[in-house]
Amino acid sequence: MAASAQVTYTTAFHALHTLGQVQAGQWVVVLGGAGGVGMAAIDLARDAGARVVAAASTPEKLEACREVGAEVVVDYEHEDLKQAIKAATGGADLVIDPVGGRHSEAALRALRPGGRLIVVGFASGEVPSIPLNLVLVKGVSVHGLDLRQLHTVHPDLNAGTLPELLGRVAGGRLHPRIDRRFTLDQVVAALHCVADRQAIGKVVIDL
């Protein structure tokens, strides 16, 4: 597992398990499913026995989400995200959100009572404004996950996470996807690839 994939998988692991308390058979929605954290979340949710709805923005990205383990895919640029999630799940148990923007509220509205929204980033570049009355009326919870803070505040939680993940990769249970590799002199191109959200999976710079 490349060093960059370690970060995405550790983030997704704590979003799903530490905060999300995912259980087998539950419906997990992953926004930005073709991104680094998104792909890791799909892979880990599938490994936990959960059912996955993945949202992405192009046919190529949606197909990649299916290949990793998403049962349902949603093109959230052309479909009504809330309605698509509700139609597939009847109300999701858990949403993993590395994207932010306008899709966050739609996903929150698609949670079942008691569901959980885990915010792990704002890849869209837009921080969403979510009406807090939705949290109260729907009886859902919203959690934020910053891996750096987790390392600082709860170092004990991370002690066994990486060895566990590496063991699952070695055992064939997890399949990290590296989309593109760049050399150090191609770092500008690599940054553009990430900023323009072209990658499907993780981008790696070889030192």
Regions found by a protein language model. Give the residues of each.
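Local beta-strand N-terminus motif with an aromatic residue
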Residues: 25, 70, 91-93, 174, ...
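Mid-domain Rossmann-like dinucleotide-binding core that forms the NAD(H)/NADP(H) cofactor-binding site
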Residues: 2-78
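C-terminal hydrophobic helical "lid"/dimerization subdomain
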Residues: 156-207
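N-terminal Rossmann-like NAD(P) cofactor-binding module of classical short-chain dehydrogenase/reductase
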Residues: 29, 74, 93-96, 118
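Glycine-rich phosphate-binding loop and adjacent beta-alpha segment
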Residues: 56, 102-171, 206-207
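Short amphipathic alpha-helix with an adjacent loop that forms part of the alpha/beta core around
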Residues: 80-90
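Short glycine-centered segments of the SAM/dcSAM-binding site in methyltransferase folds
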Residues: 27, 51, 94, 115-116, ...
